[in-house]
Swiss-Prot record:
UniProt keyword terms in alphabetical order: Aminoacyl-tRNA synthetase, ATP-binding, Cytoplasm, Ligase, Nucleotide-binding, Protein biosynthesis
S-S bridge residues: none
Protein name: Tryptophan--tRNA ligase
Any one Gene Ontology BP term: tryptophanyl-tRNA aminoacylation
One Pfam family cited in the UniProt record for this chain: tRNA-synt_1b
Amino acid sequence: MVEDFKVTPWEVEGVVDYNKLIEHFGTSPLTEELLEKTAELTKSELPLFFRRKFFFSHRDYDKVLQDYEEGRGFFLYTGRGPSGPMHIGHIIPFFATKWLQEKFGVNLYIQITDDEKFLFKENLTFEDTKHWAYENILDIIAVGFDPDKTFIFQNSEFTKIYEMAIPIAKKINFSMAKAVFGFTEQSKIGMIFFPAIQIAPTFFEKRRCLIPAAIDQDPYWRLQRDFAESLGYYKTAAIHSKFVPSLTSLSGKMSASKPETAIYLTDSPEDVEKKVWKFALTGGRPTLKEQREKGGEPEKCVVFKWLEIFFEEDDKKLKERYYACKNGELTCGECKRYLISKIQEFLKEHQKRRKKAEKQIEKFKYTGKLAQEMWDKAIPEPLKG
């Protein structure tokens, strides 16, 4: 792909140069001007995801803000592929999505792609992905979305999505899909069709769709933008996040398939302490003496990166910690202890909300205001084929 890293919808390798990725994908930087406009329209302080440039790139976010300002509105769409338990890296974009829903007061559609994960993961049965769909939905509900403005749907249940995907699939030839996703003669035919299903929710409303997601998912929306207007809809907009690194390295991203690299949302306090102490990469010097004399290197430290991305809300405290590390005033052990306490505190509250979500799942999927509308809604005319 680009230089020494690789980014596709299915794998991320190497230390990602996000500026080069913007150039390669043809997206635009999420500028200070756009962030200031967001704060102005929402009359709110920006969350750390925006302040610290965790979301760094976009497609047509400027048009989303213009639509909102001029009264046309927009809607949100994101999703989750249920192949296993969710970890910290999975849930962070959902918190950004929650902020957008809350501040702009818009509808949100969350697609659970149990079909995709069955097709793409040789080791998973369809029953496996349905099981993980339920477990993952509990974690998503625990984020705190508005149950009357949020529709969570599984592709295997909400079969109306298939009817919508048919005319979309007719717009995409194999050479287009191959160029974007790198399909080969060994690719399953279900994999080749699946992009049409993932694109379908961008047409749930006759407004512009905004997708908050990690940038590795951008290829799906590039395809949508090629033909959306021919169906009488808007090209979808997107804001792209960076990747949350694993505990063990700043390269690639956290992976559920490597338990030692991830903190799962169901981990116990003991699990958290053990993993951070044993596996978390730091920017410390080989000896305490060198650490005191030369200072640490927070730029190379996963512990600091996790605090920056999610676990230290206070900008002043984060800055103080950065310079205390650089000046040799902090040891790696002190930083690890601090991160452990932050993660444990977050998971304690998340797991309480997750338990309550068991009684809310019906509302998000079937009985909430937006959910009922979607189950009753007819297929839009342009998507009837």
